[in-house]
């Protein structure tokens, strides 16, 4: 659970530390607003992706399943600034052909995105959760994102995108499976 009172007090302390008056008209409600925002932005902290993946269907489908361009936003754990982009997920069902509803994969993305996060770990967590939850033959995850910590501060390079991947099972072992996945996520239309 979140300690909203501690968040409010911390925001008030930051405002004072930067020389602002937390009681002035535009800032009076800021600590409360930030506490509510953090409760929403970090709601994945209290969610278990295994629960989302528990319900599936054994359809005998043995071919690659891909959902691409899943939009997300998250908060960089280094600066607490947002990063956002898209996630592409592919998996190859196991011998039973167990699949899940495609919205379940988007929910797994949301759970891991709504935590203080780094993009590399997020890709790994999504891939591991799907591999463990579906017991599939393979999982591929590619994340493309723009990080506000590179846009607003430091190097200040808007438009630069970070791409990370996590490959498990057949996607890690088979260059053909990996190439097919990468080709399909590049396909426009």
Swiss-Prot record:
Its EC number is 3.5.4.16. GO terms for cellular component: cytoplasm. Pfam families: GTP_cyclohydroI (PF01227). It catalyses: GTP + H2O = 7,8-dihydroneopterin 3'-triphosphate + formate + H(+). GO terms for molecular function: GTP binding; GTP cyclohydrolase I activity; zinc ion binding. Keywords: GTP-binding, Hydrolase, Metal-binding, Nucleotide-binding, One-carbon metabolism, Zinc. It comes from the Bacteria. InterPro entries: GTP-CH-I_C/QueF, GTP-CH-I_N, GTP_CycHdrlase_I, GTP_CycHdrlase_I_CS, GTP_CycHdrlase_I_dom. GO terms for biological process: one-carbon metabolic process; tetrahydrobiopterin biosynthetic process; tetrahydrofolate biosynthetic process. Zn(2+) binds at residues 76, 79, 149. The keyword Zinc applies. Pathway: Cofactor biosynthesis; 7,8-dihydroneopterin triphosphate biosynthesis; 7,8-dihydroneopterin triphosphate from GTP: step 1/1. Belongs to the GTP cyclohydrolase I family. Homomer. This is GTP cyclohydrolase 1. The lineage of its organism: Bacteria, Bacillati, Chloroflexota, Dehalococcoidia, Dehalococcoidales.
